[in-house]
UniProtKB/Swiss-Prot annotation:
It comes from Enterobacteria phage P21. It is found in: Host cytoplasm. Residues 611-642 are annotated as: Prohead binding. Coiled coil: none annotated. This is Terminase, large subunit. Transmembrane segments: none annotated. It catalyses: Endonucleolytic cleavage of DNA to give specific double-stranded fragments with terminal 5'-phosphates. Pfam families: GpA_ATPase, GpA_nuclease. Its main location: host cell. Probably binds 2 Mg(2+) ions per subunit. Necessary for the ATPase activity. A motif (Walker A motif) lies at residues 76-83.
Length: 642
């Protein structure tokens, strides 16, 4: 006979068993989950076994798994563990968050290889994943080279990105692009891979787009394009072990007072020279555990990808989109000595140098000196506008070039994908310090333009060059029109400078004096001007178009836009690449640079998203008027009176 105590014990056990199904797992961050559950398979890992997240990987992985961040871009070199990070994040989404995922490789064959050599061994070696894969190791409809369907109902697809059909029908929560720079920029003439792929997550409650790649050619690189769409470009800053000052690691060169240095013909002597106080840092001394990711555009920073802070240290919400850059010098999987050997080998061959820049530095390769661009290339881009502002344009910026006897202003319209349309050219003759001249500049800044949809547009942001005149003139006009609308700028002809750097605070004159990286901007814009023309009715990212109006654009303006060429010059005993106008007039080019800088600062500082703005504008123009709504209620033709 069962005693009352035993009955009670049996009942308690039964209740406990029944309640197990109601237990909700404690939520884990991506890094917490990976450190607890993730294992590296021996087939594709230098160090198989339990995963341990590296300091620089923490922020990246947690951002990838952060539901409040929609888009994560990673510009990377080789040997930083990106593929393993991506697999760990995918496993986290599948097992911990029960999210459907779609991962794109550049081709179908690459996708199959990835599934066989990376995904399947990961499922086998990660117990939490294997538990969800009862079909593992045998033929099953849920176990194919394109789809893994887990017992939880969650699906993981791995497809090639070269066929447009692979971007259709799937509805997922997470879409990833591995080696995005190897994708075709236009998938079977249906659009960019990220544009097509990100359509698959639009219905998700927590949509996530992860893009990662070693970069390729500057100006045409897919990961560079993706990164430029984000307002936040993060670099990993680590403290100097001697002076404590933070800095992100740079390769440097012979002329740089920082970066990797070594004795001639002795790669083993390599050390890092601190850019703040010239401290000598050896690789074994560098402690990355106190590093933090800092945005070079906004000053925003994070240590862990979970909590974000402003440059002043105030906690702020996570960004909608974020870009990271990481390169080989941070990796424990190689040595600085090997980086030097790779560099010396690369110097022997131009192709090797390109490979070094892409795969070791994680930077885009800038095509060097080329022939001067023929202005006829731009004349071939002349198209007929249906209005002063073409239909696809959603944002206007202007650049003003200051001369001693005039101001020249060019107005540019921008469409999604940074498609550019020249809208207007205004030359204001007169002394720059005379009020009458400046009043005409005021009128030009406030001029209204008729859009193809019938509405009026004004210039949203202006970059006004202070070179050649008293800067106070521009400062006063900036305050008159709004210190955020009219930005005084000065050029910085130094390679590697951002297109525009806006200070966090006003200067002593009460305005934001911005620095424009003219060489960087010209590199970008010349690459776009060289591109083959496309039909005006075909939206083309980065295309540059000119109006069929000789008052605005003629051979004169075309010649000014191509006035400069990239030349090699010896400076201080070192060969440098410089933009040289050969004393040709180049005002149109300068104004385009400033107008483009105005666009870029709008993206970086005010999170301008041309695609979102276009969608908003489309919804606004298609919304029925009160008159049309009244007609619909009264039974007009097709709901509206005509």
């Amino acid at each position: 006979m069962i005693s009352d105590a035993q009955k009670a014990a049996n009942a308690a056990g039964a209740i406990a068993t029944g309640l197990l199904s109601l237990i909700i797992p404690v939520p884990l961050t991506t890094v917490q989950w990976a450190n607890k559950h993730y294992y590296l398979p021996k087939e594709s890992s230098y160090t198989p076994g339990r995963w341990e997240t590296l300091p620089f990987q923490v922020g990246i992985m947690n951002c990838m798994g952060n539901d409040l961040i929609r888009t994560v871009n990673l510009i990377k070199s080789a040997r930083v563990g990106y593929t393993k990070m991506l697999l760990g994040v995918e496993a986290y989404f599948i097992e911990h968050k029960s999210r459907n995922s779609l991962l794109f490789q550049p081709t179908d064959s690459a996708a199959e290889d990835f599934m066989k050599s990376h995904v399947e061994p990961t499922i086998r070696d990660v117990p939490a994943m294997l538990e969800l894969a009862p079909w593992f190791g045998r033929k099953h409809r849920d176990n194919t080279l394109t789809l893994k369907r887990f017992s939880s109902g969650v699906g993981f697809w791995c497809l090639g990105g070269a066929a447009a059909k692979n971007y259709r029908e799937k509805s997922v929560d997470v879409v990833c692009y591995d080696e995005l720079s190897s994708f075709e920029p236009d998938v079977e003439k249906e659009g960019s891979p990220t544009l097509l792929g990100d359509k698959r997550i639009e219905g998700s409650v927590w949509p996530k787009s992860i893009r990662g790649s070693t970069p390729k050619i500057k100006g045409s690189c897919q990961i560079e394009k993706a990164a430029n769409e984000s307002a936040h470009f993060m670099r990993f800053y680590v403290p100097c072990p001697h002076c404590g000052e933070e800095q992100y690691l740079k390769f440097g060169d012979d002329a740089s007072p920082f970066g990797l240095k070594w004795e001639k013909n002795k790669p083993e002597s390599v050390f890092y020279l601190c850019e703040h106080h010239g401290c000598v840092i050896h690789q074994s001394e560098l402690d990355q555990s106190n590093g933090r990711w800092i945005c070079e555009n906004t000053g925003m920073w994070t240590r862990d990808g979970l909590m974000f802070f402003s440059a002043r240290g105030d906690e702020i919400p996570p960004p909608r989109s974020i870009t990271f850059h990481i390169w080989t010098a941070y990796s424990p999987f190689t040595t600085w000595v090997q980086i030097v050997y790779d560099w010396l080998d690369a110097l022997k061959d131009p192709n090797g140098l390109k490979t070094f820049v892409n795969t070791t530095l994680g930077e885009t390769w800038e095509e060097a000196v080329g022939e001067k661009l023929d202005h006829q290339v731009l004349m071939d881009k002349v198209v007929r506008y249906t209005a002063a502002v073409p239909a696809r344009v959603v944002y206007l910026t202007a650049g003003i070039d200051s001369q001693r006897n005039r101001f020249e202003m060019y107005v540019w319209g921008w469409a999604p994908g940074e498609e550019a349309f020249l809208v207007d050219k205004i030359i204001i003759m007169g002394r720059p310090d005379e009020e009458e001249t400046l009043l005409r500049v005021d009128a030009a800044i406030n001029k209204k333009y008729r859009h193809a949809d019938g509405t009026e547009m004004t210039i949203s942001r202006v970059c006004w060059d202070i070179g050649g005149i008293d800067g106070e003139i521009v400062y006063q006009r900036s305050k008159k029109h709004g210190v955020f609308r009219v930005l005084p700028v000065k050029g910085a002809s130094v390679y590697g400078k951002p297109v525009i750097t806006m200070p966090k605070t006003r200067n002593q004159r009460g305005v934001y004096l911005c620095e424009v990286g003219t060489d960087t901007a010209k590199e970008i814009l010349y690459a776009r001007m060289k591109a083959d023309p496309t039909p005006v009715d075909e939206a083309t990212s980065y295309a540059i178009r000119f109006p069929d109006d000789p008052e605005i654009f003629s051979q004169t303006e075309a010649q000014q836009l191509v006035a400069e060429e990239l030349v090699e010059k010896w400076e201080k005993g070192k060969m440098r690449l410089l933009w040289d106008n050969k004393k040709r007039r180049n005002e149109a080019l300068d104004c385009l640079v400033y107008a483009y800088a105005a666009l870029r600062v709008s993206v970086q500082r005010w999170q301008l998203d041309l695609a979102v703005l276009a969608k908003s504008r489309e919804e606004e123009t298609t919304r029925p008027t009160l008159k049309e709504l009244a007609a619909k209620l009264s039974g007009g033709v097709n709901g509206y009176s005509r």
